[in-house]
Regions:
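RNA substrate-binding interface of SAM-dependent RNA methyltransferases
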Residues: 3-93, 159
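Short, glycine/charged-enriched secondary-structure capping and boundary segments
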Residues: 27-29, 53-56, 102-106, 126-129, ...
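Active-site/ligand-binding-proximal alpha/beta "capping" segment
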Residues: 93-128, 132-136
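Structured adenosyl-cofactor binding patch, chiefly the S-adenosyl-L-methionine
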Residues: 125-165
Length: 165
C-alpha cells in the first residue's frame, strides 16, 4: 500500500569509486531515511565502516545500518544488476534528458548510478545504462551539484514517486 514504509524497495543507488568519507556519511543518512540498498564499485572505493565515516554517522544519531554491496569493478556491478532485472539510470550534467521527464518502468527496481566525485560518469559508462538524466538547474549560477546534494534530490524524489503518489 502506498505510504507504508515496509513496501518493496524500489530505489537503490550505485556509486562508481566513492572516496570521500563526508560524502559517504551523507549518502548513508539518505539511504537510511528511504531504506535503500547502496552498491559501490571500484577497487579504490573506501569502505563505509571506516572510523571517519562511522563517527560522522553516529554524530548525526543515525542508528540504522545501511546495506552496502561492493563490486570490484563497475562492469561487474552493471552485469550483476542487469542479471537481476534492475533498470539502470545514470546521472550526468552533460545529457539533455531532464530527471522529471523520465518514464520509469513499473515492473523493475530502479538503480540510480552516480559517477566519481570529481569527474562523474564517463561516456563509456553512461552507454552501459538504460538511460542518463540530469537535474535541472540554472547553469549561469551553479556549474554542478555536489554528490550528496544530487543523491538527496534524486533519491527522495524517486522514493516519493514510488511510495506516496
Amino acid at each position: 500500500m502506498k505510504g507504508e514504509i515496509d513496501i518493496m524497495k524500489k530505489v537503490e543507488l550505485l556509486f562508481d569509486t566513492i572516496r570521500s568519507p563526508y560524502d559517504i556519511a551523507h549518502i548513508i543518512q539518505v539511504a537510511n531515511a528511504i531504506d535503500c540498498v547502496i552498491y559501490t564499485a571500484g577497487k579504490n572505493s573506501i569502505p563505509f565502516d571506516i572510523p571517519k565515516v562511522v563517527s560522522k554517522v553516529k554524530s548525526w544519531n543515525i542508528t540504522g545500518k545501511v546495506k552496502e554491496i561492493h563490486y570490484d569493478t563497475f562492469d561487474e556491478a552493471i552485469a550483476d544488476l542487469r542479471s537481476k532485472g534492475k533498470y539502470l539510470i545514470g546521472t550526468s550534467g552533460n545529457t539533455n534528458k531532464i530527471f522529471y521527464d523520465l518514464d520509469l518502468p513499473d515492473d523493475k527496481d530502479i538503480v540510480v548510478v552516480f559517477g566519481t566525485e570529481t569527474s562523474g560518469l564517463t561516456l563509456t559508462k553512461q552507454e552501459m545504462l538504460d538511460e542518463t538524466i540530469k537535474l535541472p538547474m540554472d547553469k549561469s549560477k551553479v556549474d554542478f551539484l555536489t554528490l550528496p546534494v544530487a543523491v538527496s534530490a534524486i533519491a527522495y524524489e524517486l522514493y516519493r514517486k514510488y511510495n506516496f503518489e
